[in-house]
Amino acid sequence: MNNLHRELAPISDVAWAQIQEETSRTLKRYLAARRVVDLLGPSGVALSAVGTGHLQTIAAPGDGIIARQREVKALVELRVPFELDRQMIDDVERGANDSDWQPAKDAAKTIAFAEDGAIFEGYSAGGIRGIRQGTSNPIEPLPTDVRNYPDAIAHSLSVLRLVGVNGPYSVLLGAEAYTAVAEARDYGYPVLEHLRRIVDGEIIWAPAINGAFVLTTRGGDFDLHIGQDFSIGYSSHTDTVVRLYLQETFTFLLLTAEAAVALSPATPT
C-alpha cells in the first residue's frame, strides 16, 4: 500500500489502464514547460525540498560562532479531485471501450495549466518565481498585427544572443497567439512557416501562458524538480461514484535570469 490507496478503489485493472491512458494523453497535450526546461526526477514522494546552494546568515548560538542556514526550496503539492461514475467503471469490465473519462481529462488539464502557470508566470504562495517575473530582459508586448510576430521573435532572439545566451532556442505561444499565427498569412506565405525559418527549435502551443516566451533550450538554465510525478489516487466511493484525485509535487528554479525573453499579450488598439 502507498499514499495513493488505489488498491482500495472499486476499479478493475482494465478500467485503471483506460483512466491512466486518457489522463496521460491529456497531460501530454497541455504540458508545455517540460518540453523546454530541465526535468530532474521524479525523485519520489518523500522528497520535500531541494537545496539552492545558497546560505543565509542567522543568529549565532554563542560568542565566537558564525551561524548560517542552507537555503532550500520546498516542493509544492498540487491535487485536483474528480469523480467518476461507477456504472462507467463497471462497464469496462464487461468490454465497454466508450466509458466517459471526461472528469479525469478535466483534472489533467487543470493540473497541467497549474504547473505551466507556476513555471512561466510564477506562484508566490508556493515560493516559485516564474520566468516572466525573473527574467532580466525587457518585457515587451506582442505586436497587434500578427504579421509582425516574426520581427518581434527575431528581436527577442537577438536580445538573447547579445546577452551571451546561446541556442538552440524555442518559442512558446499562448493559445490566442498561436491560433492567430497558425491562421495568418503575409502576402500569401504562412506566418507560422516564417517563424519556423528563424527559430532553430520548436514553436510550441502553450495554452497556460499569456503572450509568448522566447528562450534557450541549451540546458542548465531552468530546473523543474519533480518529487511525485502525476499520479492518480483514491479518496472514497459511494454506490454511484468513485472519488479520485490527480496529484504531483514539484518546484521550479530559474537559474539564469537572462536565458528567456517574455512577451506580454498584444495591447488592444
Go through the PLM ranges and name each one.
Residues 71-73, 158-161, 233-234:
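A generic local secondary-structure boundary/capping motif
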Residues 53-98:
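Long, hydrophobic/aromatic-enriched structural stretches that serve as scaffold segments
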Residues 132-194:
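Extended, solvent-exposed, turn-rich assembly/linker loops in the middle of proteins
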Residues 34, 38, 115-122, 161-164, ...:
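Long, hydrophobic, amphipathic alpha-helical segments used as structural scaffolds
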Residues 1-68, 227-228, 233-243:
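N-terminal "assembly arms/tails" that initiate or stabilize quaternary assembly
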Residues 90-155:
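Alpha-helical scaffold segments that mediate packing/assembly in large oligomeric complexes
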Residues 125-128, 176-180, 210-211:
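Short, catalytically relevant binding-site loops at active-site mouths
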Residues 40, 184-269:
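Sequence/fold signature of self-assembling virion shell proteins
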